[in-house]
Regions:
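Positively charged, helix-rich recognition surfaces that bind polyanionic ligands
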Residues: 1-244
Length: 244
């Protein structure tokens, strides 16, 4: 792939092509407890970076609400009154418009520390996801994933915070570009496939597994004992290979 920057420079990027005797086809399921579960049984733990700093973030937000700044309701009400008063003074040349209130130094200091902590959390997550996705791509010659829409999943208020902390879309996007760079097919199966409920051995569907609290189950037809997430990853791989 050739890129040009004006008429001065030219960059050539060559896609990396790997030949690995030990590489395998893997299915990948994403989750909250483990961010990635592979069909070969490998699990990548979700580090919950934001959850670990939750109390610090809450404390800072509380401090911001008590300081003179945009997070304070009295500050917002005061500026609202000033705006309305200035608006009514537009046609009066003899009246001078009042300046809006500015945040206090204490507010700005806490706001800066809050932003630093948020950036640190984002950087920790990004670094970890780069390492995880690089390891997955290194051992695979085919990757199957499941189609999902985080926006719809976030409507579940019980899981919204955990889903936001997991940043599943960010993980998948990193996996996609690394797979493309290494010429590894990455195929997504359908969104509404019952991957968790279907036995990866005989294809029997167990509706009881719809309950998210069921982490392990035994197939009523063939008697195979399943880990919920690993079984889903195996089904994702099978469906993705059929979709390819």
């Amino acid at each position: 792939i050739t890129f040009y920057e004006g008429n001065k420079k030219e960059y050539d990027i060559y896609r990396e092509t790997r030949k690995c005797a030990e590489c395998m086809s893997v299915g990948l399921d994403v989750g909250v407890k483990d961010i990635a579960i592979l069909s070969n049984g490998k699990k990548y733990e979700n580090k919950h970076f934001k959850e670990k700093k939750k109390q610090s973030l809450i404390k800072m937000n509380r401090q911001l609400s008590r300081r003179w700044g945009p997070a304070n309701s009295a500050f917002r009400d005061y500026n609202k009154e000033i705006r309305e008063e200035n608006k009514s003074n537009d046609d009066a040349e003899d009246k001078k418009n009042k300046e809006l209130a500015k945040p206090s130094k204490g507010y700005l200091k806490i706001q800066k520390n809050h932003a630093k902590l948020e950036r640190r959390i984002a950087l920790q997550r990004e670094t970890t996801y780069h390492q995880m996705t690089a390891e997955i791509v290194k051992q695979a010659n085919f990757i199957g994933v499941e189609t999902f829409y985080v926006k719809n999943m976030m409507k579940n208020h019980r899981l919204a915070y955990a889903l936001g902390d997991a940043a599943m879309s960010d993980f998948i996007s990193k996996l996609k570009y690394k797979a493309a760079r290494s010429n590894i097919p990455l195929v997504a199966c359908g969104m509404f496939e019952p991957t968790s409920q279907m036995c990866s051995v005989c294809g029997e569907i167990n509706p009881k597994v719809k309950n998210l609290s069921v982490r392990e189950w035994t197939c009523p037809r063939c008697g195979t004992h399943h880990d919920r997430d690993i079984n889903a990853a195996k089904n994702i791989l099978t469906l993705a290979q059929k979709t390819e």
